[in-house]
């Protein structure tokens, strides 16, 4: 074989060698393939050449296919020098500790498979492998690549195992070194372990914590008890006193509804708590009153600076923060004003301070402003609502108040103020003109007993209503719950005996918005103008009520359950006196009359006897159209809200329906009595005004009263005070509008319930007996009074 023509093929980068490579012989087939430039060997010139190096400038880089490399693996042996260099590279890259578990060298693995070992490679080669030329292997060196791969896999596995052993040895060494020092020292515990709830509170912190708890529980009901605990909480130093006053002040300003209670507390504490010497030599002693007034003054004077700081928050990301701070400042300002007013009532604040505050809020003086700030306007309204009556009681203060209200009247027409504030100022001006009597009751904290007393006055509730009987009638029947309480129909409210909402009990009132029941026991929605009660009531048929022969006299439908009311009312309205097709056992047990136990009662005549007065009222009234009724209710609601007589007169004249004036009178009485006793006076003034203006005739007033009396038996179930209030209205109309006293007898005849009759008659006699003109009327109508007394028996 001719060596001059053998191509040199190398696996090193660049694809070339430095000349002929002895010992690198190929098989004839592979040599033939390497001699040409066919598909198996494609030359790429220029990409791998290095300028200046003759070995890389003219040589070709040869690429092999996968099949050729597989053939090379079978015939090529890796030289020992390459294996040695590979080991040195691993040492430099990974360190000796990563490969210390390997065999001495991969050369040993190689030499174990060779027939003639080379001892000169057993030593570590420290020469520079980059500068030396690779020595060609011996001709007889043959090694399979599979053996090399298996050897490398075994080497990696042994390296991982040795690494784990090495890590375990290091841990053992650490524990052994610690064991030589001695036993582990015991855990050192702190003398006072930290705890979120444990700690040694100082005397001041303990007192403040106690005071906070007392203030959180303070109510008008427990006022005296908790006030004593507060006095005994341990307020023994001036610092504790100041902090306690700060706590009370903060609670008061953020709870304005309870300001009267906190003002009373401050007054009592000012009398009971001791004073303390001043911290500064020659200073005034520290008292509860002085510290409290200083807090009020600082809060009042510091509000302006707080608003200035809030005004600086103009960034878009500060909008929420600005609103929150404005709300807090407003609450503190109004609460502070309310507290100062309540302290004035307790004689803890002199009037000169109050006048100074009013002048500051209104902007009086040399620097008088054309329009005060909105916060100041709201504060001054709050101030006069609280203490206006007290200031007017003093003649000197009243003259000063006159100047204040002149300026406030100017604010009612100042367009620079928001409409809400203008109306607020106007309400205060009207309040003073009305002798400081508010249109609606002020919301204030009440005790449980006060709430019960108010319920008795407003709803007519009486103690022990469940155990009492009225006019010899039994307690209401009906199904009982497992606890023994009456079962309720939907919308009847509570279920406890004697409470509002229990069927048939005094003060029984439906829940707002709940449906009513018609005479067939069907639930129907209630409208605002619908008469109150458990069933639908049509005005026409109800006015033509049959006489007592159609209805057993011993039964009071008000005391029957809701389901049984229809059994009686249905036959009465239809004009048939016979019992229903399925007699109720409940009705039989309540009546005990032979008329219901008889198998075939006699039918009543087609023309039952009717009270003549009721016929007269029915003949003179007509059913009001729905549109007119809606307008009537609307204008009456508006009048009871603003109470302007001329405007109400104009609205009634615009209806142009004189034939329905009696219905309007009835609606006015119904609406006023439904609202409560405070609306009796506006109702009477309205009817007197319309009668004086010749809009309502005396006959309209009489018919309207009779129409309402026909509904009173059902209305009285929901409004126990309705009979007494209605009697007062009738008496006042008799005194002022010329309503004849005989109408009282007619009204009593229209009401079948003796209890309601008595309520009406007693109210009439009481109202007219307290007036000289009324006494004259009573003396001239002794016959009518006797007839009324007979109706009460």
Curated annotation (Swiss-Prot):
Residue span(s) of domain MI: 627-749
Lineage: Eukaryota, Viridiplantae, Streptophyta, Embryophyta, Tracheophyta
GO biological process: regulation of translation; translational initiation
Signal peptide: none
Family matches, as SUPFAM superfamilies: ARM repeat
Span list, region Disordered: 1-23, 105-129, 462-606
KW DNA repair (keyword) present: no
Family annotation (InterPro entries): ARM-type_fold, Initiation_fac_eIF4g_MI, MIF4G-like_typ-3
Similarity-based family: Belongs to the eukaryotic initiation factor 4G family.
Biased composition (Low complexity): 544-557
Residue spans of biased composition, Basic and acidic residues class: 120-129
Protein name listed in UniProt: Eukaryotic translation initiation factor isoform 4G-1
């Amino acid at each position: 074989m001719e060596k001059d023509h053998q191509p040199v093929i190398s696996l090193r980068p660049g694809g070339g060698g430095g000349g002929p490579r002895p010992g690198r012989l190929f098989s004839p087939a592979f040599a033939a393939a390497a001699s040409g430039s066919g598909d198996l060997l494609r030359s790429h010139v220029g990409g791998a050449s290095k300028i200046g190096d003759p070995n890389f400038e003219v040589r070709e880089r040869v690429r092999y296919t996968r099949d050729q490399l597989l053939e090379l693996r079978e015939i090529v042996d890796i030289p020992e020098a390459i294996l040695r260099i590979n080991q040195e590279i691993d040492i430099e890259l990974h360190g000796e500790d990563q490969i210390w578990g390997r065999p001495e060298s991969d050369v040993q693995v190689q030499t174990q498979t060779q027939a003639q070992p080379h001892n000169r490679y057993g030593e570590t080669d420290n020469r520079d492998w980059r500068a030396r030329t690779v020595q060609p292997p011996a001709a007889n060196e043959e090694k399979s690549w599979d053996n090399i791969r298996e050897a490398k896999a075994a080497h990696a596995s042994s390296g991982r195992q040795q690494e784990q052993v090495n890590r375990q040895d290091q841990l053992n060494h650490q524990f052994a070194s610690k064991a030589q020092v001695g036993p582990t020292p015991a855990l050192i515990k702190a003398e006072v372990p930290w705890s979120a709830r444990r700690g040694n509170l100082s005397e001041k912190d303990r007192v403040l914590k106690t005071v906070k708890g007392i203030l959180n529980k303070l109510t008008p009901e427990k006022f005296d008890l908790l006030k004593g605990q507060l006095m005994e909480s341990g307020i023994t130093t001036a610092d504790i006193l100041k902090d306690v006053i700060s706590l009370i002040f903060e609670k008061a300003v953020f709870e304005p509804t309870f300001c009267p209670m906190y003002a009373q507390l401050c007054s009592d504490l000012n009398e009971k708590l001791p004073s303390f010497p001043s911290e500064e030599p020659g200073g005034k002693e520290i008292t509860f009153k002085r510290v409290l007034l200083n807090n009020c003054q600082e809060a009042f004077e510091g509000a302006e600076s707080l608003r200035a700081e809030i005004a600086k928050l103009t960034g878009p990301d500060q909008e929420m923060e600005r609103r929150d701070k404005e709300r807090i400042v407003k609450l503190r300002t109004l609460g502070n004003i309310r507290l100062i007013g309540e302290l004035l009532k307790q004689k803890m604040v002199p009037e000169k301070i109050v006048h100074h505050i009013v002048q500051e809020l209104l902007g009086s003086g040399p620097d008088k402003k054309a329009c005060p700030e909105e916060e100041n306007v709201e504060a001054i309204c709050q101030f006069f609502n609280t203490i206006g009556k007290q200031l007017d009681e003093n003649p000197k203060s009243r003259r000063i108040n006159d100047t204040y209200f002149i300026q406030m009247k100017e604010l009612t027409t100042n367009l620079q103020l928001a409409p809400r504030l203008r109306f607020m100022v106007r309400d205060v001006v009207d309040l003073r003109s009305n002798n400081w009597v508010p249109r609606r009751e002020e919301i204030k904290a009440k005790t449980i007993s006060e709430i019960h007393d108010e319920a008795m006055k407003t709803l007519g509730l009486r103690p022990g209503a469940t155990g009492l009987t009225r006019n010899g009638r039994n307690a209401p029947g009906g199904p009982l719950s497992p606890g023994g309480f009456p079962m309720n129909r939907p919308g009847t409210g509570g279920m406890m005996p004697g409470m509002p909402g229990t069927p048939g009990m005094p003060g029984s009132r439906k829940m707002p918005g709940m449906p009513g029941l018609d005479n067939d026991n069907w639930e129907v929605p209630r409208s605002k103008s619908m008469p109150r009660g458990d069933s639908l009531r049509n005005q026409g048929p109800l006015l033509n009520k049959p006489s007592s022969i159609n209805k057993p006299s011993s039964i009071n439908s008000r005391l029957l359950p809701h389901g049984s009311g229809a059994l009686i009312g249905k036959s009465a309205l239809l004009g048939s006196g016979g019992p229903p097709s399925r007699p109720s056992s409940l009705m039989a047990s309540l009546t005990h009359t032979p008329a219901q136990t008889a198998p075939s009662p006699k039918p009543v005549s087609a023309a039952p006897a009717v009270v003549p007065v009721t016929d007269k009222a029915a003949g003179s009234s007509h059913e009001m159209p729905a549109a007119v009724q809606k307008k009537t209710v609307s204008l009456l609601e508006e009048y009871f809200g603003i109470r302007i007589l001329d405007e109400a007169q104009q609205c009634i004249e615009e209806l142009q329906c004189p034939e329905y004036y009696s219905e309007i009178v009835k609606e006015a009485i119904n609406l006023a009595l439904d609202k409560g006793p405070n609306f009796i006076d506006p109702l009477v003034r309205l009817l007197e005004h319309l009668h004086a203006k010749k809009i309502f005739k005396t006959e309209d007033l009489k018919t309207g009263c009779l129409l309402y009396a026909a509904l009173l038996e059902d209305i009285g179930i929901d409004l126990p005070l309705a009979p007494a209030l209605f009697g007062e209205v009738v008496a006042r109309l008799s005194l002022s509008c010329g309503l004849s006293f005989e109408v009282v007898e007619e009204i009593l005849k229209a009401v079948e319930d003796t209890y309601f009759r008595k309520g009406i008659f007693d109210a009439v006699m009481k109202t007219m007996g307290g007036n000289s003109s009324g006494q004259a009327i009573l003396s001239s109508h002794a016959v009518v009074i006797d007839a009324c007394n007979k109706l009460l028996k």
